[in-house]
Each structure stands twice: as structure tokens, then as C-alpha cells.
Curated annotation (Swiss-Prot):
Superkingdom of the organism of origin: Bacteria
Keywords (A to Z) from UniProt: Ribonucleoprotein, Ribosomal protein
A GO biological process held by the record: translation
GO molecular function: structural constituent of ribosome
UniProt gene name: rpmH
Upper lineage: Bacteria, Thermotogati, Thermotogota, Thermotogae, Thermotogales
The family this protein is said to belong to: Belongs to the bacterial ribosomal protein bL34 family.
HAMAP family the record matches: Ribosomal_bL34 (MF_00391)
Name of protein: Large ribosomal subunit protein bL34
Organism (species): Fervidobacterium nodosum (strain ATCC 35602 / DSM 5306 / Rt17-B1)
Length: 44
């Protein structure tokens, strides 16, 4: 059986990257909250 996690840098960046977060209202909310909690990393 094929496993569910098939890592790919391109997919990872496009789905969870900074520009992806920045481009939607929900993503901007995520960035805002992560900045507020003082995350060392905002995105992947």
C-alpha cells in the first residue's frame, strides 16, 4: 500500500509557503497569529 506522505519541496512550498499564506485572508490571519505568538518560523 502506498503511504499518504510523499514529500515534495514544490508541493510543500506552494501549499504552505509564505506567498501562499500571504495571498489569502485566512493565510494572512495565520501569519498574524504566528507573529503574535512569537514563532521563530512563520512558514515552512
Amino acid at each position: 500500500m502506498k503511504r499518504t506522505y510523499q514529500p515534495s519541496q514544490r508541493k510543500r512550498k506552494r501549499t504552505h509557503g509564505f506567498l501562499a499564506r500571504k495571498s489569502t485572508p485566512g493565510g494572512r490571519k495565520v501569519l498574524r497569529n504566528r507573529r503574535r505568538t512569537g514563532r521563530w518560523r512563520l512558514t515552512v
